[in-house]
Amino acid sequence: MQTVRVFDTWVKASGRTLHFDVITSNEATALRLANEYVASQGHAAVSVTAQECRYCHAEPLVMFSEHQQRQFHESGGFIVPLTA
């Protein structure tokens, strides 16, 4: 069974807090995906670091949807938006 790593991410941007999980296999990919996600939310000037994007725990990949599993295999991971 394939296991993925969950990176809990909190980012302050333009007076609001973005909270999301990055599901991937390593920290470098987590930071890349986190920065891409933050930029897609209109905050390209914000840089996500390992201080905001921290490894939290591991989960089996099969617990996520087929779409998310496909994203993991095609892009190296995916984002799960959460409420702040």
Where is each model-derived feature located?
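Short, flexible N-terminal segments of the mature chain
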Residues: 17-43
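Short, charged/polar N-terminal "headpieces" of proteins
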Residues: 1-17
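Alpha-helical structural elements
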Residues: 2-5, 32, 67
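Acidic, low-complexity intrinsically disordered segments
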Residues: 37-84
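Generic structural motif
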Residues: 12-14, 25-27, 84
